Amino acid sequence: MSCPYAGNGNDHDDAAVPLSTEVGKIYGEYLMLDKLLDAQCMLSTEDKRPVHDEHLFIITHQAYELWFKQIIFEFDSIRDMLDAEVIDETKTLEIVKRLNRVVLILKLLVDQVPILETMTPLDFMDFRKYLAPASGFQSLQFRLIENKLGVLTEQRVRYNQKYSDVFGGDEQALSAIRSSEYEPSLLELVQRWLERTPGLEESGFNFWKKFQQSVDQFLAAQVEIAMEEPVEQAKNYRLMDIEKRREVYHSIFDPAVHEALVKRGDRRFSHRALQGAIMITFYRDEPRFSQPHQLLTLLMDIDSLITKWRYNHVIMVQRMIGSQQLGTGGSSGYQYLRSTLSDRYKVFLDLFNLSTFLIPREAIPPLDETIRKKLVHKSV
């Protein structure tokens, strides 16, 4: 069957009219397939002991790296668009579109793991000796993705050495790592964007003050309900639960407590950015906050899918080499990979925890006419 985009879609029409009379590259030349399809060098074959599944191993990891390259391409373009004082609705729509593309790519990468799992541990052992000292830990592009997303160096789990040391004397790789560490990450740019959320201004709608008042009223109403509980033990339990909730809310209303949690690594956003994220979450049904809410949701999807990919990778490694063997690059293998599943690698952790601070819909402060008019004319 011929490509429908190459002619008029008629498989039997040998006189297809070309789209252009200009001389161009044919399919294989344009995609440089001669280089791409000749890049699978099986070391077992060179050793005259060819192992069939080594070919699958190479192809799968090369496919990962190609998709990593596309993710970096999308992240860089998104960071460029976010790096502005004002982001109009058109740009927000484009950012949402490209983040969604990254989400779909990551879903594809997660689904690639079962293909590798068609290889048995014994099959893998047949060629594993050829891999050392190579290791997935040495994937430069995955490290760049982490840094561009916002994984902090101090949050990383160390294994024997700093993560960038595995690139040794590769100055080009080290330069790329350094640049990715010092350039504004997606986390930093999203934080700046959230800090500008309209409605946070103390001289205007002052959402944060209204939210605190709503929380106080909500908790006071809960106390009244608890006090009517006839069973003393149940009443005390309810009152204790309300006090715990009050402490949780206090952690976002007191800037000093919030800052302490940031320094401890339990929160990522600045206090102002967290306020913006909560406001967007509450008013996501408002037209002006619809796209920003989609953007925040997609950031959580990206974090979730990377975690899911890490988890699938961990399970596959345990299945292939067990829990005690070292990785081919000298890491602790399964133990190291399992440690990367913690929240310290979750960049947009604060977005996942927003549900902790929700209040009933009827308690959410209503938008007044002034802020509604402002939202009509102001980009977020």
UniProtKB/Swiss-Prot annotation:
It comes from the Eukaryota. Binds 1 heme group per subunit. Its EC number is 1.13.11.11. Its cofactor is heme. Pathway: Amino-acid degradation; L-tryptophan degradation via kynurenine pathway; L-kynurenine from L-tryptophan: step 1/2; Pigment biosynthesis; ommochrome biosynthesis. This is Tryptophan 2,3-dioxygenase. Heme binds at H313. Heme-dependent dioxygenase that catalyzes the oxidative cleavage of the L-tryptophan (L-Trp) pyrrole ring and converts L-tryptophan to N-formyl-L-kynurenine. Catalyzes the oxidative cleavage of the indole moiety. Belongs to the tryptophan 2,3-dioxygenase family. Substrate binds at F57, I58, I59, T60, H61, R128, T328. Homotetramer. Dimer of dimers. GO terms for molecular function: heme binding; metal ion binding; tryptophan 2,3-dioxygenase activity. One of its GO terms (biological process) is L-tryptophan catabolic process to acetyl-CoA. It catalyses: L-tryptophan + O2 = N-formyl-L-kynurenine. Pfam families: Trp_dioxygenase. Keywords: Dioxygenase, Heme, Iron, Metal-binding, Oxidoreductase, Tryptophan catabolism. InterPro entries: Trp/Indoleamine_2_3_dOase-like, Trp_2_3_dOase. It is an enzyme of class 1 (oxidoreductase).
